[in-house]
Every structure is written in C-alpha cells, then in structure tokens.
Amino acid sequence: MDQISYFNKTVASKDMSGYYLLKNGEYAYNKSYSVGYDFGSVKRLDRYDMGALSTLYICFALKKHDSDFIKAYFDSLKWYREIYMISAEGARNHGLLNVPTDEFFDTKHYIPQDLAEQRKIANFMIALERRIVAQQSLVDNLKKYKRGLSKAVFS
C-alpha cells in the first residue's frame, strides 16, 4: 500500500533490514486472524512492483502453478483444514497464530496438476469476480439514486 495515501505520511523506517522484499506476483501469509479469516490470509502482491513485509509474514513464490488459480484457491479458504492441523495460538500472541514456517510449507494441498485445468478455473473465477464488482457498482449507484430521490421527495 502506498503509505502517503493511506497514512498521509511515511511510517516506515529507512532501515529495511529484518523485512522481506516481496515482488509482484509473490504471496504472503498473514498469520493474524480477523473477521472472516480465522486462520489468517494468503494474499498475492498485485498493485505494486515490490513491497516490504515484516518477518512475521511467511512469503513465497510459486513457479509450477497458474498464479491466478492459486490466488483463487487461497481466497477460497479451502486450505484452512491444513493450517488448522499445525496452528496453535498462545495467550500472548494477540491473535497471531503460531504457524511454523517449515510446517506451513509441508502442508498438503489437493489441487489440479494440469495447468490448462487450473487456467480454466482461474478464468472462471476472474470472470465471476468481475461480474460481482459490476453488480456491486450497480447496487451502489442505485443506492445513491434512492438517497437523492428520497431527499427530493421528502424535503
């Protein structure tokens, strides 16, 4: 994320030692749970060429799979079953799951090995996401229209 537009200032230190450099298309696992993400989340860096992440994240790149398919897979939360088996939460972790890096990379994921099949699934998920975004935009515009109409009618 762009710090200036989000925080209205630069909040990062000039000393970047102790951080991971994530490149566009690479993934990071955030071990913190939040609403809707009981076992954390895996996200792909898409908006920027590079980003710096704390060593609290588990960062990785994939070479043998379709990246859009893997993004959809991690968005599905299907992988939670494996994380559940290896995670523990300590009393002082403030919502940070104890997921050892080596065990994270040893988890089993049952995904199609055929790249063409992965690509078909990814294309379907991308088309569906675009449809959702378009429908949400339509809903947002209708809500604005309703507010304007209500204001005109009831004032």
Listing of model-derived features with the role each one plays in the protein:
Residues 50-56, 89-116:
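A short glycine-rich beta-alpha junction/loop motif
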Residues 10-16, 93, 115, 126:
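Short, solvent-exposed loop/turn positions at domain surfaces
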Residues 1-28:
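Sequence-specific dsDNA recognition surfaces
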Residues 76, 101-104, 147:
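ATP/adenylate-binding site constellation spanning eukaryotic-like Ser/Thr protein kinases
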Residues 55-58, 68-69, 105-106, 123-126, ...:
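Positions in alpha-helical segments
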Residues 20-24, 28-79:
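A short beta-sheet element
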Residues 111-155:
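Amphipathic alpha-helical coiled-coil/heptad-repeat segments
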